[in-house]
Design a protein with these regions (language model features):
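Non-catalytic terminal accessory/regulatory regions of metabolic enzymes
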Residues: 1-78
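C-terminal substrate-recognition/cap domain of FAD-linked oxidoreductases
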Residues: 44, 55-61, 65-89, 271, ...
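Glycine-rich N-terminal segment of FAD-binding domains in flavoprotein oxidoreductases
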Residues: 55-63, 68-154, 191
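A glycine- and small-aliphatic-rich helix-loop capping segment at beta-alpha/alpha-beta transitions
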Residues: 84-85, 136-155, 185-189, 212-220, ...
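Alpha-helix capping/hinge segments and adjacent helical runs
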Residues: 514-525, 549-551, 555-559
Length: 569
């Protein structure tokens, strides 16, 4: 386990929690900014006041040394990090904690744990960073199981081997973003996969959930970096061959990527790495409307330029994040390379933006440590320099990396808001604001009508349950055939009814997303929360094949039951 203790609810560590006074000050400012009525800020239920159900099973003697069942460890592994999870944890409601938490030191420990779980009919929940926002790590099981445990991979966090010739690294599944980046930096390399959860999430978790990261185009998901995967299932270990590419039948890698802990515990993977970029160019571009900006982004995505950053923020989100005054959409545009200057690519991209009525400002270029900045964009959001991440263009400063970006102006403000989002969400819960996000992908030809209907459904559902709503959208990733829009819904919460409000909004918007032919998730995964809509999205024969694969590697159905497929009775 980590030396620093995680909060038993919400995001982050115990030693970085804001004081009650700081929470109240932040809450007052947020309520005013959103235009929501002020409410009394509540304090979370302390760990000392938490009461958990008694464990149903205890660790066997031969594994007792790597297992713990104290209140903190059970509570902190009972929930993920969705809005509903944070609300439940905030109020001290941990109805389904794991019976104990196991922290394997090596693969043999994982094997022994799964052997015991299969023999005793105990559910095994792989746990990386616990950052799931879709109900992916809850140890919720029915009476067909004698209990449930969490298997915390924090003890498997090393970069084991680096192949500098092939530019690949063998990394254990429990390595967090900061863990692996710090170790790769010793070799002058980087994975450059920076999801918003980078600080706490793990390589194994990224692979299990098909996480998306730094690059807005081309290499959008973790699977684009996966060379091979190794997992331990109840029936034994399985590992794919290291290959740059293969046409030999269905891919074993792709079966494990996105398996969400149902087919085994991902203990390590070979991933493609690269030198840190030495050439960058970035700029902010304003558009009078989100629709006009979307047309420009479509042109950029189909141009063959492949910008590393191409994220469009609508006026509502720009205003909320203080990167704009609400009168324009903002495009965060950037290029990077470890080999050559990227100014010419930026020149052509800006020409495309100009053809669509975009107004650029705050262009910045750097090559091998030499920065060159030009111009700025003034009113309603200041100058623009490019910031980082959406599902991570640059990791949080606390992550221990050395890369920086221009934090001034509109895009800098948006970047900082992005990095603070998980912490702000905890404050939302304390101040009585409901917060939910919907991320999806759809083809360009259907996007305009789809966007209108999703916005309308989100606003109607939030206003129906809360009386007011703040709904915004941004593109997290873009493809030649369509965007990946990401919708945020904020609304006043009714104390004591937050989870019911959240569920009503979740269902209303998810229904529209699936009915319109979009995906229920682009990068948050399925978990338990998205199961009803995922079941409708996937073909029935594929569902049957997936059940067959699970039966082959997990015949007792102990691996994360209820996720992706129904548990066996």
């Amino acid at each position: 386990m980590n030396a620093r203790r995680r909060k038993h609810w919400g995001w982050g560590f115990e030693d970085e929690q804001p004081s009650p006074e700081e929470v109240r000050a932040a809450a007052g400012g947020l309520a005013t900014h959103l235009g929501f009525p002020p409410v009394e800020v509540e304090d979370p239920v302390s760990l000392e006041a938490v009461r958990l159900p008694a464990p149903r099973v205890v660790a066997p003697a031969e594994l007792a040394g790597i297992c713990a069942a104290d209140v903190h460890v059970r509570a902190s592994h009972a929930l993920g990090k969705s809005y509903s999870d944070v609300v439940l944890g905030f109020r001290g409601h941990f109805e389904h904690p794991p019976d104990f938490v196991a922290s394997p030191r090596d693969e043999r420990d994982v094997e022994r744990l799964l052997e015991w779980c299969a023999a005793e009919r105990v559910a095994a929940i792989p746990y990386g960073g616990g950052t799931s926002v879709v109900g992916g790590v809850q140890p919720v099981v029915d009476s067909n199981y004698n209990g449930a445990i969490s298997i915390d991979l924090a003890g498997l966090r090393q970069v084991v081997e680096v192949d500098e010739v092939s530019r690949a690294a063998r990394i254990q599944g429990g390595a967090t973003g900061p863990d692996l980046e710090a170790q790769l930096a010793e070799h002058g390399l980087t994975l450059r996969h920076f999801p918003q959860s980078f600080e706490l999430s793990t390589l194994g978790g990224w692979i299990a959930t098909r996480a998306a990261g730094h690059f807005a185009t081309v290499w959008t998901h973790i699977e684009d970096f996966v060379e091979s995967v190794r997992a331990i299932a109840p029936t034994g270990a399985w590992e794919s061959r290291r290959l740059p590419g293969s046409g030999a039948g269905p891919s074993p890698d792709r079966l494990l990527v996105g398996s969400e802990g149902t087919l085994g515990v991902i203990t390590e993977a070979w991933v493609r790495v690269q030198p840190r970029p030495t050439h960058r160019a970035s700029v902010g571009v304003r558009f009078p409307t989100f629709a006009i900006g979307a047309e420009c982004v479509r042109a950029l995505s189909q141009s063959g330029l492949h910008p590393s950053n191409c994220r469009l923020i609508d006026p509502a989100e720009a205003r909320f994040t203080m990167s704009g005054d609400g009168t324009f959409a903002l495009l965060v545009l950037g290029f990077e390379s470890c080999d050559h200057p990227v100014g010419l690519s930026m020149d052509r991209a800006l020409a495309i933006c100009a053809e669509h009525g975009g107004l650029a400002g705050g262009r910045r270029e750097s090559s091998e440590g030499r920065d060159r900045s030009r111009g700025g964009v003034g009113a309603g959001g200041g100058g623009t320099g490019v910031g980082g991440p959406k599902k991570g263009d640059a990791p949080p400063a606390r992550a221990g990396t050395t890369e920086t970006s221009d934090a001034g102006g509109g895009i800098g403000a948006w970047r900082e808001a992005f990095l603070r989002a998980p912490y702000v969400r905890d404050i939302f819960v304390a101040m009585g604001v409901l917060s939910e996000t919907f991320e999806t992908a759809i083809t360009w030809d259907r996007f305009p009508g789809f966007h209108e209907r999703v916005i309308a459904a989100a606003r109607a559902a939030a206003e129906d349950t809360s009386g007011a709503a703040h709904v915004s959208c941004r593109f997290t990733h873009v493809y030649p055939d369509g965007p990946a829009p990401y919708y945020t819904v904020l609304a006043p919460a009714q104390r004591g009814e937050e989870v019911e409000q959240w569920a009503a909004i979740k269902a209303a918007v998810s229904e529209v997303i699936v009915a319109e032919g979009a995906t229920i998730t682009h990068h948050h995964a399925v978990g338990r929360d998205h199961r009803p809509w995922y079941d409708r999205q996937r073909p029935d024969p594929f569902a049957a094949a997936l059940r067959g694969a699970k039966a082959a590697v997990d015949p007792q159905a102990v691996m994360n039951p209820g996720v992706l497929v129904d548990p066996l009775s």
